[in-house]
Amino acid sequence: MRPAYDDPRTTDQPITRARPPPRAARGRRLGEEPLTEHLVDPDVPRDLHAFIAGLPKAELHVHHVGSASPRIVSELAARHADSKVPTDPEALVDYFTFTDFAHFIDVYLSVVDLIRTPEDVRLLTYEVARDMARQQVRYAELTITPFSSTRRGIDEGAFMDAIEDARKAAEAEFGTVLRWCFDIPGEAGLESAEETARLATDDRLRPEGLVSFGLGGPEIGVARPQFKPYFDRAIAAGLHSVPHAGETTGPQTVWEALIDLRAERIGHGTSSAQDPKLLAHLAERRIPLEVCPTSNIATRAVRTLDEHPIKEFVRAGVPVTINSDDPPMFGTDLNNEYAVAARLLGLDERGLADLAKNGVEASFLDAPGKARIADEIDTYTAAWLAS
């Protein structure tokens, strides 16, 4: 019997809700499982990969444009022939190989430049949701940078309509609930902060799915305190604060995000491990870190996976969530990030289920929604272990 989940890279079949495959179906040939060869970590048992593939999940740190699959990127590049982005999906593998964080930003912005019409926005958003659903993502807070689109001439109202139309279609067709985080592209300065805050707080424009306000882009030379007035406005309008911090800079940046931007979660927070007082603060206040292991290696924020500080975070009692950041660009997906976490933390099925529930608990979903997904995780895990 074939598992009720499919590899988003190899099929366009309808998406169905996952259930644990029977024991006989586990360990079957590669190609019949949800992960492709290059994503199957040989240090993680095949049974555990199969468990992860069907595990209901929430994802809290994943970027809109950065989640565009090679197929969608190549389609958009073909639409806009003046772009330097390759139209061949195979060539994108080399194009998405980064020398450092600055190079990643350059490549990322070249893909951003492909999103030029409301139709591009809707296509991207809908297809990102489709890929999430195939990984059993029940709920996701997708980071969107509206400034990058409106400055390229997309009407702001049409932009909001496009993401909302895709959100509603995705929930109706795939069962995946999307919510938005509007983030400031830090490299674009205070002009982008003003524009993003306006779009996030203007009741005539603010989309129904918006729940949080963030800050992304390079950290070096982009001080967090300068964005305080814009976060204050967003928080006053009822949005949650979720800035990136401590990805490529030291723990002081995380402190600034906590103190000046009133962060409720920290994007990455990788350097927090360098400051015991900061770890204790995060643990005591139950402030989650949105950890993205493969991303940190791809951008050279961390040298190797074995050196990733996720183990220090867990030992210190800091709430940890697992995320994919910009998955196709980093040659990963959320299932693979769970497999990486399983290896680094020595997790079995119950440990992975607890990790998935961390993501649900740290989300901005309402209490009934959290309880529903947590119950689904428990039911799935119990059925798997009993089979």
Curated annotation (Swiss-Prot):
Q: Name one GO molecular function term.
A: hydrolase activity, acting on carbon-nitrogen (but not peptide) bonds, in cyclic amidines
Question: Is-annotated flag, keyword Hydrolase?
Answer: yes
Q: Which residues bind substrate?
A: 116, 183, 217
Q: Which GO biological process entries does UniProt record here?
A: menaquinone biosynthetic process
Q: How is the cofactor bound?
A: Binds 1 zinc ion per subunit.
EC number in record:
3.5.4.40
What this protein needs as a cofactor is:
Zn(2+)
One Pfam family of this chain = A_deaminase
What are the record keywords, sorted?
Answer: Hydrolase, Menaquinone biosynthesis, Metal-binding, Zinc
Q: In what pathway does it function?
A: Quinol/quinone metabolism; menaquinone biosynthesis
Catalytic-site annotation from UniProt: 247 (proton donor)
Q: What does this protein do?
A: Catalyzes the deamination of aminodeoxyfutalosine (AFL) into futalosine (FL), a step in the biosynthesis of menaquinone (MK, vitamin K2).
Family stated for the protein in its record: Belongs to the metallo-dependent hydrolases superfamily. Adenosine and AMP deaminases family.
Q: What is this protein called?
A: Aminodeoxyfutalosine deaminase
**Species this chain originates from:** Streptomyces coelicolor (strain ATCC BAA-471 / A3(2) / M145)
